[in-house]
Each structure stands twice: as C-alpha cells, then as structure tokens.
Amino acid sequence: MPREIITLQLGQCGNQIGFEFWKQLCAEHGISPEGIVEEFATEGTDRKDVFFYQADDEHYIPRAVLLDLEPRVIHSILNSPYAKLYNPENIYLSEHGGGAGNNWASGFSQGEKIHEDIFDIIDREADGSDSLEGFVLCHSIAGGTGSGLGSYLLERLNDRYPKKLVQTYSVFPYQDEMSDVVVQPYNSLLTLKRLTQNADCVVVLDNTALNRIATDRLHIQNPSFSQINQLVSTIMSASTTTLRYPGYMNNDLIGLIASLIPTPRLHFLMTGYTPLTTDQSVASVRKTTVLDVMRRLLQPKNVMVSTGRDRQTNHCYIAILNIIQGEVDPTQVHKSLQRIRERKLANFIPWGPASIQVALSRKSPYLPSAHRVSGLMMANHTSISSLFESSCQQFDKLRKRDAFLEQFRKEDMFKDNFDEMDRSREVVQELIDEYHAATQPDYISWGTQEQ
C-alpha cells in the first residue's frame, strides 16, 4: 500500500531545490520531462505513486504544490522543459506579486490572507491520495516567503492534519559572512520556533557546509546556486530511495523518522553523502565497499552541516540511519557495523543503545553510476545545537539594539510589541539546552525535575 507524500515548495529557494528534486526523480524513474514514461523504463519494481499520480492520459504528475509570493522562479520553471510536468492548478502565485521582501512578518501575514486558496490546493491533493502519509516542505529559513509563509503553513498543517507527518528540508543561511538579508537572524529564529514545535522531522541543509563541500570535495571554485541545489537534490532523492524502491524495511516515512528520533523535540537531522566526485578519472581508482562508504559517512568533511567543535560538551550521536544504494552483500553490512562499534568510530549517547541502522536500497536501473556503492547518512547528532547557537547570537546582536525592526512593525502581529520574537528566542534556547542535556546520562529524567 503506497503511502503518498505531498511536497510543498515555498519561495525562491524552496521552488529551486524542489525543481531539481523532481528533475532527479524523473531521471531515476525513467519519466520524461513531459511526465510520460520512457520506452526503456519497463522495470515495474519502483513505486512511482508515492510522489507522483497518474492523470487520465497516463501522464505522471508530481504530488507537488508550488507556492510563491513573487513570480520569478515559478515563471522560470514554467519556461523550462519541465513546464508540462506539473499540475497547473497546483501552482499558486500571489495576486500582487510583490513578494515578502525578505521579511518573515510579511510572509506570515500574507499567509493568513491567502490561506483559503492555498488550502484548497492542498486539500484537493490530499483527497486525491489513497492513504496520505504526510507532507514534505522545502523552504529556506532566512528570506521572507520560505520562512514566513512556511511558518504559517507549518502551524496550519498541524491544526488541519494533526495525524499526518510533516517533514521539512530547511535551508539554513550562511553563517560566516554577512548575508544579503539584514533581518535574516530575525527570520531564522521566528521560523526555528515553528520547526521545533510544528514539524516532525527537519532535515537541515546548511548553506555554509554545502558551499564548503562543493569547493573542497567537488573542486568548484565559486559554486553557483544551481550546483549547490544539485547537491541538495542528491540528498533529497537519496533520502527517499527506500520509499521509492521499497525493501522490507524503512519503506515508509514513519519508519525512517521513528528510527532517528527517539524524543520528539530533538528532530533536527544532518546528512552526509559519499562518494562525491564529479571527476570521472578519480572515480575509478577505488573499489567502494560498504565499510568504506560507512566509514566515510562518519567523517566530518562529508557531513553537510557545519557545526563548531565545542570543548565543553561531549557531543554525540543520538541515532544514525545509513541508506546504502547499490550492489551490497548484506553480510558485509553486519561486519561493517561491528567494525564501527569495535573501533568506536562514532560516539553515541550515554542513555540509550548505540542506534546505527542500515537500510539497503536499489539504485535506479535507468541512471548510469560511476560507483558500485553510494551512501547517505541521516544522523541525529547533538552538535547541531551549535547551528542554533550561532543563530541566537546573531539575533541577540540585532535585538539588543532593536535594529531593523521597522519593517516588522508594519505588520499587525508586531504592531504593539515584539513578544513573538522573544518567545521564539526562548523556544530555541530550550531546544539548545535539551540538546546539551541529551549528552548526559541523566537525560531520561531531564525536564521532570523542574516541574
């Protein structure tokens, strides 16, 4: 029984990474840019209907909803070879097309105004599914639409579909240099509050780390957005392979999430991918084995979140799920896991079992691949809190001076006061504290002493 997933793409970033994701899915399932199954794609072992549905004329159409408050990116999608792939009724552009001006409050309050139009689309998609499992939301947390409208949708989805899972792919902004959005720290924290309270699972895509990987590992001098988005679509498609090429384990979203998230608030995941090479000559020198892939996945340089090394806290893994694609001998998996445990290659939480799981998945039969085995790691690691800490520091710098708050005052929500910002700051601080507490053996009783 396929459990369908509806993808919601918001704002410039969400629609760009969503576009790459669908491009990748079409390639993997042998679907042409018009949505027609290619002649060669006759192996019926993949599950297309988790992410696509078939129209009356046998076209495959993505279960995707494209939302933006300004038209540029969606117009570029509609002028691309993939224009006919999407259902035009599922594309929503706001009437005035002015965007949210990189302002969370504007995105959020526009969400309230266009709420009915958006939920008409989402409800129609949900009704068209046999047994909907949940929603996947692609957005960035720094701008206006992805963060503001994204936050609004997260809250409403919880009210409207309380039993459905909500997973997000959230792009975090650059940390080291000045961003082009001055109010980015405000936008980020306000969105983080919703990601903490209203999402079941957040896959963190950190621009800083993605850039580093593109530069160091793929040897691209100045990586462009589209090159980084390709990295992101690789992660997104690899993290859904077990849903699309089902095996006996992890073949639905709850199975993936349940193995990674033992306690509800600590649901921010980082990813790692290997082998990453664009250089064909280098690719052929090594024989990729399961152990090789799993060991590489644990190396910080392959992890797509840049976290600071914190001397005070012993950061550790809460859980790991490795999705290994390719020709794999299952006995090798067991040996590799044993080797990792014996050599203590990964440092796990003191209050629970060392949960490192492996899901084996087939590769797409239609895509040539340079490597026999490739792997994606999805890890729940306490050091992700350093990402939130740096967001908080940037927020505090601005909030202390009440800098750049004029645009926020224009919206009803912040007309009289900025309580919502300070509340968000508290929620994120509690999240950081809980991640720190999770490194201690007494975490199980954490939070019970205070009451």
Curated annotation (Swiss-Prot):
Binding-site list for GTP: A142, G143, G144, T145, G146, S147, G148
Tagged with keyword Cytoplasm: yes
PTM notes: Phosphorylation at Ser-131 by BRSK1 regulates centrosome duplication, possibly by mediating relocation of gamma-tubulin and its associated proteins from the cytoplasm to the centrosome.
Top-level taxon of origin: Eukaryota
Keyword field contains Zinc-finger: no
A GO term from the CC aspect: spindle
GO biological process, one term: mitotic spindle organization
GO molecular function: GTP binding; microtubule nucleator activity; structural molecule activity
InterPro entries in alphabetical order: Gamma_tubulin (IPR002454), Tub_FtsZ_C (IPR008280), Tubulin (IPR000217), Tubulin/FtsZ-like_C (IPR037103), Tubulin/FtsZ_2-layer-sand-dom (IPR018316), Tubulin/FtsZ_GTPase_sf (IPR036525), Tubulin_C (IPR023123), Tubulin_CS (IPR017975)
A Pfam cross-reference name: Tubulin_C
UniProt main location, coarse: cytoplasm
Modification sites for Phosphoserine: S131
SUPFAM superfamilies: Tubulin C-terminal domain-like (SSF55307), Tubulin nucleotide-binding domain-like (SSF52490)
Keyword set, alphabetical order: Cytoplasm, Cytoskeleton, GTP-binding, Microtubule, Nucleotide-binding, Phosphoprotein
Protein localization: Cytoplasm, Cytoskeleton, Microtubule organizing center, Centrosome
Role: Tubulin is the major constituent of microtubules, protein filaments consisting of alpha- and beta-tubulin heterodimers. Gamma-tubulin is a key component of the gamma-tubulin ring complex (gTuRC) which mediates microtubule nucleation. The gTuRC regulates the minus-end nucleation of alpha-beta tubulin heterodimers that grow into microtubule protafilaments, a critical step in centrosome duplication and spindle formation.
Protein family (similarity comment): Belongs to the tubulin family.
Xref: PANTHER family: TUBULIN
Subunit structure: Component of the gamma-tubulin ring complex (gTuRC) consisting of TUBGCP2, TUBGCP3, TUBGCP4, TUBGCP5 and TUBGCP6 and gamma-tubulin TUBG1 or TUBG2. TUBGCP2, TUBGCP3, TUBGCP4, TUBGCP5 and TUBGCP6 assemble in a 5:5:2:1:1 stoichiometry; each is associated with a gamma-tubulin, thereby arranging 14 gamma-tubulins in a helical manner. Gamma-tubulin at the first position is blocked by TUBGCP3 at the last position, allowing 13 protafilaments to grow into a microtubule. Interacts with alpha-beta tubulin heterodimers; the interaction allows microtubules to nucleate from the gTuRC.
Name of the protein described by the UniProt record: Tubulin gamma-2 chain
